[in-house]
């Protein structure tokens, strides 16, 4: 196995390139520990949307590579209460008066480990929220998040470990705004979902679930030309088991991108702007948009709590398969 890890500079910023004969990734720790590039080396296809300049990344950091959302998506008015404490997150979606996508996608993470093993190549990064004063004003907890990226054969494994090193419990959710290149004229998309959340004009769930009107096509592989998406789906895994995954089929390149998530990821947001930008974001979330303000069971919303001293790991993976035709 031709495993490799090297330090590089990416658009003027320190980065780590790692991979094998199948896959190559670039991780930029200072840019929210973003896997900014993922290349299938068999076909030389760039899988993720990359910025052309550092400025373009900083303008819209959640629309390149694999941004880490902690917590993911919107919190109405940036406000919620948990165990007697009221939290006020910054309003960074001013037109809808929401907090959007959490604290970590633009912060500098620390590199913990880079290593090669017989199993694959591993890059670990970590961020301690207690060291970020502007985060502590909003989320006054000693939370630590560690990302472990492993490339083994034709798969990138992403493991997110959330740790409570403080003295008080906190609610948490994590997700990824994974931004894949998606030429709509030659690509299809499938998702293991039968239901989606009804959203209001602020893109917040009303609490009502609806059947996906095109679910058969969604299961089999949809043509997304002329389809605009910013929708929140409940994974069908929650009710009937099976796989919990999104798949992109690049028909021209004869490859499939299989994006799997473990049982903690109960929801998927699918976003493609106006459908004409050449990208698609299948976003696995452990909690649904605005989960902290929904009067619904946590078993449905995905709202989880870490008590002092506890930690948990949420696992996902991206596998590239060749479609021989």
Swiss-Prot record:
Its EC number is 5.1.3.3. Keywords: Carbohydrate metabolism, Isomerase. Signal peptide: none annotated. CDD domains: Aldose_epim (cd01081). It holds the Pfam family Aldose_epim. One of its GO terms (molecular function) is aldose 1-epimerase activity. Substrate binds at residues 73-74, 230. Induction: By nitrogen or tryptophan starvation. Transmembrane segments: none annotated. It catalyses: alpha-D-glucose = beta-D-glucose. The active site is at residues 177, 283. Pathway: Carbohydrate metabolism; hexose metabolism. GO terms for cellular component: cytoplasm. GO terms for biological process: galactose catabolic process via UDP-galactose, Leloir pathway; glucose metabolic process. PANTHER family: ALDOSE-1-EPIMERASE (PTHR10091), GALACTOSE MUTAROTASE (PTHR10091:SF0). Belongs to the aldose epimerase family. This is Aldose 1-epimerase.
């Amino acid at each position: 196995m031709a495993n490799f890890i090297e330090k590089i500079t990416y658009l003027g910023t320190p980065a780590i390139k790692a991979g094998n004969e199948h896959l190559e990734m670039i991780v930029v720790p200072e840019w929210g520990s973003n896997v900014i590039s993922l290349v299938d080396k068999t076909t030389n296809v760039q899988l993720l949307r990359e910025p052309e300049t550092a400025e373009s990344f900083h303008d819209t950091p959640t629309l390149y590579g694999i941004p880490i959302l902690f917590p993911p998506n919107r919190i109405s008015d940036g406000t919620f209460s948990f165990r007697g404490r009221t939290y006020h997150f910054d309003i960074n979606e001013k037109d809808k008066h929401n907090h959007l996508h959490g604290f970590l996608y633009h912060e500098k993470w620390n590199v913990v480990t880079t290593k090669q093993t017989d199993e694959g190549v591993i890059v670990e990064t970590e961020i301690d929220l207690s060291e970020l004063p502007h985060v502590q004003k909003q989320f006054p907890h000693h939370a630590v998040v560690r990302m472990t990226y492993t490339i083994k054969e034709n798969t990138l494994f992403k493991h997110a470990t959330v740790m409570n090193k403080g003295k008080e419990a906190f609610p948490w959710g994590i997700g990824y705004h994974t931004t894949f290149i998606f030429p709509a004229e030659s690509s299809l998309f499938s998702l293991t979902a039968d239901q989606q959340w009804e959203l209001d004009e602020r893109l917040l769930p009303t609490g009502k679930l609806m059947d996906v009107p095109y679910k058969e096509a969604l299961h089999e592989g949809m043509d997304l030309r002329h389809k605009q998406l910013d929708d929140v789906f409940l994974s069908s895994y929650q009710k009937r088991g099976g796989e919990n995954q999104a798949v992109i089929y690049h028909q021209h390149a004869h490859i499939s991108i299989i994006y799997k998530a473990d049982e903690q990821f109960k929801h998927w947001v699918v976003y493609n702007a106006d459908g004409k930008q050449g990208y698609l974001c299948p976003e696995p979330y452990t909690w649904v948009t605005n989960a902290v303000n929904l009067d619904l069971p946590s078993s449905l919303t995905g709202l989880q709590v870490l008590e002092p001293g506890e930690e948990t790991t949420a696992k996902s993976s991206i596998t590239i398969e060749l479609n021989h035709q």
